[in-house]
């Protein structure tokens, strides 16, 4: 009788060990299937169809979309256009909300802009704001060359003279207040000139040079010829009308 009871106990123990081993084998095979699937890399829980649903502590959960399909991934760093947002329950990749931003530090602070845009104080611009210049090496807006206000227009002159000519040039200038941070950044023009009419064409008490007299005489002669031709044309027209 005792032998029968002992045999029965051995059978029960063997069955329990077998069930335990089978359960461990199933869990090991399930874990192995996670590891073998590239989608499940770094996951705490994963499925073949939906990918990761929970990530390991230091990784970021990213929901990747491919056409109509979407699946979860666990990444060490977030892809372009996203930033890593850490939270007690699970770290996630959140989308950058800044226009034309390629990578960002937070939802409202960009660290790198898309191609063709310049970074300035966490935002992206196609042209740098006033007072800043584009630095092509880093695609950032840096402090440019700062200049002061324009001066008043100077005296109209020509050949260092303020009389003796009909037309001259007048100039105005401005000063560089702050030099740019890079020598490659050019400053805007600090002097400009424009054509002006002299207030005194003839210098007081001055004598005209022979060249100036000759030029004036030629001009008078040309006007007299033009006037004579005009009068002759009128005379011919009147004569024809009378005939």
UniProtKB/Swiss-Prot annotation:
Chain spans, region Disordered: 204-243
Bias kind Basic residues: ranges: 204-224
Cystine connections: 40-46, 43-52, 55-74, 78-93, 96-104, 101-110, 113-124, 128-141, 145-187, 156-163, 196-203
Listed GO biological process terms: bone mineralization; canonical Wnt signaling pathway; dopaminergic neuron differentiation; embryonic forelimb morphogenesis; embryonic hindlimb morphogenesis; epithelial tube branching involved in lung morphogenesis; limb development; lung growth
Gene3D superfamilies from the UniProt entry: Hormone Receptor, Insulin-like Growth Factor Receptor 1, Chain A, domain 2, Thrombospondin type-1 (TSP1) repeat
Keyword Signal: yes
UniProt repeat feature FU, residue ranges: 90-134
Residue intervals of the TSP type-1 domain: 144-204
SUPFAM superfamilies per UniProt: Growth factor receptor domain, TSP-1 type 1 repeat
Name this protein carries in UniProt: R-spondin-2
Organism listed in the record: Homo sapiens (Human)
Lineage: Eukaryota, Metazoa, Chordata, Craniata, Vertebrata
């Amino acid at each position: 009788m005792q032998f029968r009871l002992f045999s029965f106990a051995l059978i029960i123990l063997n069955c329990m060990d077998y069930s335990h081993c089978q359960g461990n084998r199933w869990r090991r095979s399930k874990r192995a299937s996670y590891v073998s699937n590239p989608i499940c890399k770094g996951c705490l829980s994963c499925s073949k169809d939906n990918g990761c649903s929970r990530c390991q502590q230091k990784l970021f959960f990213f929901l990747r979309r491919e056409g109509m399909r979407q699946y979860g991934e666990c990444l060490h760093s977030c892809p372009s256009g996203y930033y890593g947002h850490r939270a007690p329950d699970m770290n996630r990749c959140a989308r950058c909300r800044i226009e034309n931003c390629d990578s960002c530090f937070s939802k409202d602070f960009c660290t790198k802009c898309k191609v063709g845009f310049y970074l300035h104080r966490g935002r992206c611009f196609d042209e740098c704001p006033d007072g800043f210049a584009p630095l092509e090496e880093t695609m950032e807006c840096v402090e440019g060359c700062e200049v002061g206000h324009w001066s008043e227009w100077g005296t109209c002159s020509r050949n260092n003279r303020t009389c003796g000519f009909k037309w001259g040039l007048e100039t105005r200038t401005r000063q560089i207040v702050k030099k740019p941070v890079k020598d490659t950044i050019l400053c805007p023009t600090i002097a400009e000139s424009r054509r002006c009419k002299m207030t005194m064409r003839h210098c007081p008490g001055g004598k005209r040079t022979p060249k100036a007299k000759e030029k004036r005489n030629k001009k008078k002669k040309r006007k007299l010829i033009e006037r004579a031709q005009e009068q002759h044309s009128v005379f011919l027209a009147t004569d024809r009308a009378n005939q």
